[in-house]
UniProtKB/Swiss-Prot annotation:
PROSITE patterns, per database record: GHMP_KINASES_ATP
Protein name: Homoserine kinase
Family classification: Belongs to the GHMP kinase family. Homoserine kinase subfamily.
GO cellular component: cytoplasm
Catalysed reactions, as listed in the record: L-homoserine + ATP = O-phospho-L-homoserine + ADP + H(+)
EC number, as in UniProt: 2.7.1.39
Biological source species: Alkaliphilus oremlandii (strain OhILAs)
Keyword presence, Transferase: yes
Summary of the function given for this chain in its UniProt record: Catalyzes the ATP-dependent phosphorylation of L-homoserine to L-homoserine phosphate.
Gene3D superfamilies reported in the protein's UniProt record: 3.30.230.10, GHMP kinase, C-terminal domain
Amino acid sequence: MIEIIVPATTANIGPGFDCLGMALNLYNKVLFEEIEDGLQIHGCEERFNNKENLVYTSMIHTFKKVGYTPSTGFKITMDCHIPESRGLGSSAACILAGVIGATELSNSKLNKEEILKIATEIEGHPDNITPALFGGMTVSIQDQTSIHFSKVPIQNNFRIYGLIPNFTLSTKESRAVLPQEVSFQDAVFNVGRTALMLASFMNGDLELLNFSIDDKLHQNYRASLIPEYPSIIEKLNFLDIKGSFLSGAGPAIIVIAGKDNLGLADRIQNRMLELENKWTVKEFNMDTQGALIKRWR
């Protein structure tokens, strides 16, 4: 038996659209067992208990990539804690679990860079896959043939909070509201703030972070899909935070605060009670290891 543990991720991180991501200490755990024949999937909703399951399709895709034909069936047991369609990398976690599981089951000698490439082929973009695989904060971009990435050595002098609503938002829907073109002025706005924000994380300068985490490429457009979004941001700005941003395509929101801002989760939660929808506040730590493999006899 092989268990693959994959962390949640938050992508974009304000102005870093489609290139920045960070792994969080919330996990999906997937156990793979070889059985005589057939497919058994346990631990997830009934609608995912079939051959269209993302873990399974990612596993089969990887088998084909490495030229492996399984001679057994599989039992897949899922223990998923990353909420679906909230912008916290649930699909990236399932894809990586399937790719890594297939790599182990087939005894392939794929390195992490090769796993990254296969998983990104399935996901379509590397900004969630990269931190989920390597841990920490990462910058990743892809061209026609390669994925280029680097881990960012950031200071651990801040707290991370996730505001997770009781409604979902698909990446497809969230992508659809984005413009085909943006102004040169908005592009320059994001380039400068992305560079300054990375320097702020690396230097531990949370005051600069508060200024640089702003964005003009995607958040304003996606805000229209999230009920009461302007009101939420207004409430957060009264709580002495160092910045907030949409997590991936949304609807979850990530808040960055100083280490000395104690009891913030309760104060955010109290503000969220004033809203029409239910929002759950969760404190995170950054996961620094990325996806893990455990073998059980």
